[in-house]
Amino acid sequence: IKLRHSLGRPSRSDFVQSVFVEGEVMGLLDRLKLNKTKDFFEWLDLILKNELNSEIKAINFNLYEDTDNKWSVELVGTFSFDKDNDDWACDEVFTTRDHPFVIECESDWELVETFFIGLVNEYLSSGKYAGKLKEYQAIGIGFFDGDLQILYAR
C-alpha cells in the first residue's frame, strides 16, 4: 500500500508505523484511516474556511477511481437538492475538481467508498467547520457514476 494525498507524501516510517500498532497488523481501512483522517480534515478545513458560493443548497462528495490504484474525492456545492433524485448532485455551482483529495491504495470501489464515508462522517462529528457543512440542506457522497448516499439532511 502506498498512501498519498494532494498535500504531500508520508515517509516510509509513517507507512511502517501505520501497519503495526501495538504489535498487531491492522486492516486496510484502519491503516488508511490512521494516516488519512488528519490529512482529510486539513484538506476540508482549507476549503471550508473560505466563504462558499451563496447559491449552494447542498454538498456532495464525488468519488472517482483514477489510474494506478489512485482514488480521489472532490467537494461539490449544488444549487438544488432532491432526496428522491440523485441528479441534484449534477447542479454544480462550486467544485474542488482541480484540487481533489487523493489516496493511493489497491482496493475495490466498495471499500474505498466505505473509507470515504467514514472520513466524512467523522468530519461531520468533530471537524472544525462541521457546523458550516450542516447549514446546507444535505450532504451526500458517492461515485460520480453511481448511487449517492445521504449522510446528513436537515
Language-model features, listed with the residues they occupy:
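Acidic, proline/glycine-rich low-complexity IDRs
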Residues: 25-34, 38, 42, 49-52, ...
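A structural detector for beta-sheet-dominated domains
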Residues: 64, 76, 104, 115, ...
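Short, Lys/Arg-enriched N-terminal segments with co-localized hydrophobic residues
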Residues: 1, 12-25
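Amphipathic, interaction-prone secondary-structure segments
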Residues: 46-85
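Intrinsically disordered, low-complexity regulatory segments enriched in Ser/Thr/Pro
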Residues: 71-110, 151-152
